[in-house]
Design a protein with these regions (language model features):
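HIT superfamily nucleotide-processing domains
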Residues: 1-131
Length: 131
């Protein structure tokens, strides 16, 4: 899938976090600044097709990424959204939010490439500091 290629480095991305099992990167269509996708490196079509141990590890990784996002973007909460109809590869959307209106996938914010790079680097650094 496209997410497998991104996680493998075959397609460029703004990396926010990674480990042996999972990869997190900025969504190219930012709903809010800091909108991050978390994917398993192993191709799994649907999040609930993952076995229990994989799903638990996936959520723990996403939680750590969410904590890093909240460090960079002080907000009330980091929303976790699972949709998965566009790409047949399990993934979690993490979005900094201060109200439910911030999680409107019909709305996107324009974030220039240089700013996306800076955001990803800040989230990556915050993620590393949580180690």
């Amino acid at each position: 899938t496209i997410f497998s290629k991104i996680a493998a480095g075959e397609i460029s991305s703004y990396k926010c976090a990674e480990n042996e099992q999972f990869y997190a990167f900025l969504d190219i269509d930012q709903v809010t600044k800091g909108h991050t996708l978390v994917v398993p490196r192993k191709e799994v079509d649907y999040i609930f097709d993952m076995d229990d141990d994989e799903l638990a590890a996936f959520e723990v990784f996403a939680k750590k990424v969410a904590r890093a996002i909240k460090t960079v973007f002080p907000c009330k909460k980091v929303a976790q959204v699972v949709l998965g109809l566009e790409v047949n590869h399990a993934h979690i959307h993490l979005l900094p939010m201060n109200s439910e209106a911030d999680v409107n996938f019909k709305h996107h914010v324009q974030v220039e490439a240089e700013e996306q790079k800076e955001i990803a680097e800040k989230i990556f650094k915050a993620f590393q500091e949580l180690e």
